[in-house]
Curated annotation (Swiss-Prot):
Gene Ontology terms: cellular component: plasma membrane
Name assigned to this protein: NADH-quinone oxidoreductase subunit H 1
Source organism: Rhodopseudomonas palustris (strain BisA53)
UniProt-recorded Gene Ontology molecular function terms: NADH dehydrogenase activity; oxidoreductase activity, acting on NAD(P)H, quinone or similar compound as acceptor; quinone binding
Example GO biological process: aerobic respiration
EC number(s) per entry: 7.1.1.-
Family: Belongs to the complex I subunit 1 family.
Major localisation: membrane
Annotated keywords: Cell inner membrane, Cell membrane, Membrane, NAD, Quinone, Translocase, Transmembrane, Transmembrane helix, Ubiquinone
Assembly and binders: NDH-1 is composed of 14 different subunits. Subunits NuoA, H, J, K, L, M, N constitute the membrane sector of the complex.
Length: 319
């Protein structure tokens, strides 16, 4: 009984911390984008505009949340929750430090990959539930994008799994005590970055919402907190992908002098900032270009990386 209560308290604390982290990251993103574009960015609410995310949250909560005529009411309401819930569940197996994970499971990598994939279903569900044609096109793009990136995203981390000899998040981190896997798996890290951006539906792979040609894509008809939940899921997905990348390629909590959780947080912040830099620097490709790159470039590279890594691992383990 006490163990269940303690687990509930820790889980609630983690969820609240993640919600605050997602809000703070929106401020960080806007400030970094402003710096890249040589403008000020948010600077009115709080010091350096730090409390802007609080004001935006209050504004979204206060807005009316309507269901447009012709929408599937059940699916329309369910989609925003599906966007955020799997990402929060994914953080449950992330190892923030030595013996510091909400749930230590032997197949943590597979669980995280599955949770990341579920976010695409929220996009498709919201698009199909909406009466807008723009939403439908955005949902179709999301489905095709999911099929394209999931294939090489899973293969990109397979080399790390073979070297570490485990699917456990903690064991993968411990296997990097001598050298980070970014050194041994640079191709896998690059492919994981591409797939992670696509999984989070971030620029330049935000084609399901693509404001230039689809108005707002799958979220065209959403307002109020339903709209906010989609964006909460997106920003949480960025943080989850960053934490996943740190675990797989950058040594997780390992580092000198500072405590492990601090190292993990710093590394995750740097990777998340890199995603913002990519958004500021790269244009959005055409939809057909993105799909072509995934199937004809990224997937063959991922397969080649797996084959080469497998040969090396077998050769090193041979007597």
């Amino acid at each position: 009984m006490i163990g269940m209560i303690l687990t509930a308290i820790i889980s609630t604390t983690l969820i609240m911390a993640l919600l605050v982290a997602a809000g703070v990251f929106t401020w960080v993103e806007r400030r970094l984008l402003a710096f890249v574009q040589e403008r000020l960015g948010p600077n009115r609410v709080g010091p350096f505009g730090f409390l802007q995310w609080v004001a935006d949250t209050v504004k979204i909560i206060a807005k009316e949340d309507e269901i447009p005529p012709g929408a599937d009411r059940v699916a329309y309401r369910l989609a925003p929750a599906v966007a955020a819930t799997p990402v929060l569940a994914g953080f449950g197996v992330v190892a923030f430090g030595e013996n510091l994970a909400l749930a230590e499971i032997d197949v943590g990598v597979m669980f995280l990959l599955g949770m990341m994939g579920l976010t695409a279903y929220a996009v498709v569900l919201g698009a199909l539930a909406s009466p807008s044609r723009f939403s439908l096109i955005g949902g179709l793009r999301a489905a095709a994008q999911m099929l394209a990136y999931e294939a090489f995203l899973g293969l990109s981390m397979l080399g790390v799994v073979m070297i570490a000899g485990s699917l456990s998040m903690s064991e993968i981190v411990r296997a990097q005590e001598n050298v980070w896997f970014i050194v041994l798996q640079p191709i896998g890290a690059a492919l994981f970055t591409l797939g992670g951006i696509a999984a989070a539906h971030r620029t330049p792979f935000d084609l399901p919402e693509s404001e230039n040609d689809l108005v707002g894509g799958y979220i065209t008809e959403y307002t109020g907190m339903s709209f906010g939940l989609f964006f909460l899921g997106e920003y949480l997905a960025i943080l989850l992908v960053s934490a996943f990348a740190v675990t797989l390629f950058f040594g997780g909590w390992l580092g000198p002098w500072l405590p492990g959780p601090i190292w993990f947080g710093l590394k995750t912040g740097v990777i998340a900032a890199m995603f913002v830099w990519i958004r500021a620097a790269l244009p959005r490709p055409r939809y057909d270009q993105m799909v072509t790159m995934a199937w004809k470039v990224a997937l063959p590279l991922a397969l080649a990386n797996v084959l080469i890594t497998g040969f090396i691992v077998v050769a090193r383990s041979a007597p």
